[in-house]
């Protein structure tokens, strides 16, 4: 059974490393998007004012609501036990060890899946799962990532019509099929 949290990964990490032959239980780069997702998975806010929904965000909330402490504590615990070494900075930093078979688990966006499958090249089976929480009891979801698209409202009707035409093309079945197969995003 695939763990749904860092707590769950910790529970099986010894077996992954000592019985399963993985050098690392978890290979995860230091990356802001992961930090944001761990906050969301806890159901907590990144910024004040309802994450900027009730009023403009003016300060971070994660330093006062316990989210950051939970993330760093759980990750440091895995690091201190030798289960999750520091593999560097960036969203793809953890992929190298995973693709080489040195790590049992890595974190990433679906956008990384094509790269992982190409790198693994059939040398082992790759499975996917939902982004983990910190604790097994975390019930939050994840937030959107960098592949979101925004259209700015303005007073230029010609630009607005052109923008809408572009959006219609992007959401067409043909465009979405190409996007999903080429990037991993869905």
Q: Where are the language model's segments positioned?
A:
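Short helix-initiation/N-cap motifs at beta->coil->alpha
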Residues: 4-10, 86-100
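Paired acidic/hydrophobic, glycine-rich loop segments that form the ligand-binding mouth/hinge
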Residues: 104-109, 127
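Glycine-centered hinge/linker elements that transmit conformational signals in sensory
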Residues: 12-14, 56-88, 131
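Short helix-loop capping/hinge motifs at secondary-structure junctions, enriched
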Residues: 1-2, 19, 45-47, 68, ...
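Extracytoplasmic/periplasmic substrate-recognition and gating elements
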Residues: 81, 118-185
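Beta->alpha turn/N-cap motifs
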Residues: 91, 108-113, 131, 146-148
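Short, solvent-exposed loop/beta-turn-alpha elements that line the ligand-binding surface or hinge
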Residues: 45-70, 118-120, 133-141
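Extracytoplasmic/periplasmic solute-binding protein
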Residues: 7-60, 103
């Amino acid at each position: 059974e695939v763990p749904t949290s860092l707590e769950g990964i910790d529970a099986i990490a010894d077996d992954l490393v000592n019985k399963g032959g993985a050098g690392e239980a978890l290979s995860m780069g230091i990356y802001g998007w992961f930090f944001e997702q761990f906050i969301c998975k806890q159901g907590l806010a990144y910024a004040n004012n309802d994450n900027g929904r009730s009023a403009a965000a003016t300060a971070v909330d994660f330093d006062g609501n316990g989210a950051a402490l939970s993330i760093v504590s759980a990750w440091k615990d895995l690091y201190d036990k030798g289960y999750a070494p520091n593999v560097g900075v960036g969203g793809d930093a953890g992929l190298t060890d995973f693709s080489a078979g040195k790590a049992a688990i890595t974190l990433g966006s679906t956008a990384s899946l094509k790269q992982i499958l190409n790198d693994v090249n059939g040398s082992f089976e790759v499975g996917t799962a939902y982004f983990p929480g910190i604790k097994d009891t975390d019930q939050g979801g994840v937030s959107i990532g960098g592949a979101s698209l925004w259209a700015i409202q303005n007073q230029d009707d010609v630009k607005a019509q052109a923008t809408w035409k572009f959006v219609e093309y992007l959401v067409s079945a043909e465009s979405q099929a190409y996007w999903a197969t080429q990037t991993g995003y869905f």
